[in-house]
Amino acid sequence: MEPDGYVEELPGTILIYKENQYAASEHSVLKKDGDIVLQPQPSDDPNDPLNWNKFRKNWHLVLICLVSLVTGAIANDAGSAQDQMNAELGISYDAMDNAAGVLFICVGYFTYLAMPATFLYGRRCVYLVCLLFGMLGSMWFALVKTTSNSIGNQAFIGISEACAEALTQFSVSEVFFEHERGIKIGIYILSTSVGTYLGPLAAGYIASSQGWRWIGWWGLIISGITFVLFLFTFEETTFDRAAAIDRKQIQISNDQLTVKEDFDLKDMQSDIKPDVEKSDAMDDSKMKVDYTVNEISNAVQPIYSKPSYWKRIALITPANSLSGIGFRQYIMRLFQTLRIFLFPAVLYSGLQWGAQDAWLSFYLTTEEEDWMEAPYNYGDNAVAIMNVPCIIGATIGCIYGGYFGDYFTLWAAKRNNGIKEAESRLWLMILPCIINPIGLFMFGIGTARHWHWGPTYVGLGFIGFGWGCAGDISMAYLMDAYPGMVLEAMVGVSVINNTFGYVFTFACQSWIDSLGTERTYISIGVLCFIFIATSFPMILCGKRLRKWTAKQYYTFLNVRNRLDEKIPDQDRRGQDGVESR
């Protein structure tokens, strides 16, 4: 271990409490919130998003959740119009299934294609482009006349949801500290759940009262309002924190001595007296060092200027390293991002979130088929109301995985000498590992045997609980494990997740037809248990896997940072190794 709070060069293992003997020094330079060491360490620049006041941070989160809710709703409302579209336009149900598959593909792979633009041109432009596609897709849906139209508009709507699949989590990580992210990701998952489950409910009422085309018109109106809010109130969060910290220095007039934040020994002069003390917990080569600055006079504090409102909401915020229009950098980043699929934590998180999308295809299909026939004889509105138990369960799951998850990881860190391990969060997967499969069993078996609606609705609530917390916990774990590549990691999760959704969109109906409802839900309940149970190997071996991939992780970051460099004939002196976003 190293002094001044640097635990070891292992991603996902961080010092979170100052009681740790290497950070408890009175003169420690680590910034804290009470006893909690802030991770990542913010700069002193008030323009750093980590230093924003609570209102700016919370409004940023509100907009992130709003775009997740809106895009989730318009991506799931087409099913409420299927019967009327079939009767009026003759569009087959198979064509509508194809449209749903196209939507999943566009969500996952446009997330991948948009990722480099986030670094090169800023976050705002990606959000705005996606919302624009949502507006166009909704309008196209309202004007559908042919089968090709019905597929094309879903492609546009899929592109719109891409911003809510990876960029939203990245935005959370830019504004909130690591010990705050679990609950924030939980709120994001809850917003996605509200859109996913209540979007079809609202669309069903719109279709029955105003006609199915008004689903598209209302989607256009709500997406348009969201677009305007983002255009004028969503601030750009591009900030080169590493460069800002490197620039910070204190001038000591007596000796003209510069003391850098990293307290590099070669910069220390006679006015700084080292007090070296051997620690039993350290190797012979490692020492605990407390530096006492006798006198710092006439210190020159840096002057920070706040960007104007119009600069903070600029349509494009080009990276400092942008060369020309950035085409070469864009292509190189696309290829670089493919490396994320070599990280086990990315595959694990993608599996958890993708499985939830897969089960969604099954129970939505069952609701629309079995529950609209005898003995239930539900209508469109009654089927839509079946999503209410899911949203209740998802709300509880998000509170469990988010708020309680953050509390649990801090509690575990206190018991570990102030050291927080990423895998501590995965202990919370025990509950969904039990509850989620039980929910699938209750709903599937209850539907097949025509149980009273009560137990089957409870089953839907259990399924919603799994939806709410499995994705929250696994994605928060991934963000903790590899904090330097949050966006790229979430892109990987999105690709895996939506590939699952695409495959099971076509597989679920054949599965149900061949096995029957009861046996199908028994089989996917077992699969659900197996998928979530992969959390236990991650708990036991996750740290070992992080050690195994640590070199690969830092190589990934170094290569990415080199991609940020301008072409050789442009001067980048002093910027080597600093990521410019």
From Swiss-Prot:
Q: Which domain of life is it from?
A: Eukaryota
Which SUPFAM superfamilies would you find in this protein's record?
A: MFS general substrate transporter
- Chief site of localization: cytoplasm
* Ranges annotated as spanning the membrane: 61-81, 100-120, 125-145, 187-207, 214-234, 340-360, 382-402, 426-446, 458-478, 486-506, 522-542
Q: Where can this protein be found?
A: Cytoplasm, Cell cortex; Membrane
Positions modified as Phosphoserine?
28
Asked if the Swiss-Prot or TrEMBL record annotates the protein with the keyword Cytoplasm, the reply is: yes
Q: Please provide one cellular component term from the Gene Ontology annotations of this protein.
A: cell cortex
Q: Gene3D superfamilies this protein is in?
A: MFS general substrate transporter like domains
The way it spans or sits in the membrane comes to: Multi-pass membrane protein
Q: Per UniProt, which keywords does this protein have? A: Cytoplasm, Membrane, Phosphoprotein, Transmembrane, Transmembrane helix, Transport
Gene Ontology molecular function terms on file? transmembrane transporter activity
- Swiss-Prot/TrEMBL GO biological process terms: transmembrane transport
Indicate whether rRNA processing appears among the record's keywords: no
Cited PROSITE patterns = MFS (PS50850)
Similarity remark: Belongs to the major facilitator superfamily.
Q: Which PANTHER family match?
A: MAJOR FACILITATOR SUPERFAMILY, PROTEIN HOL1
Q: What is this protein called?
A: Uncharacterized MFS-type transporter C1271.10c
Organism, by scientific name, is: Schizosaccharomyces pombe (strain 972 / ATCC 24843) (Fission yeast)
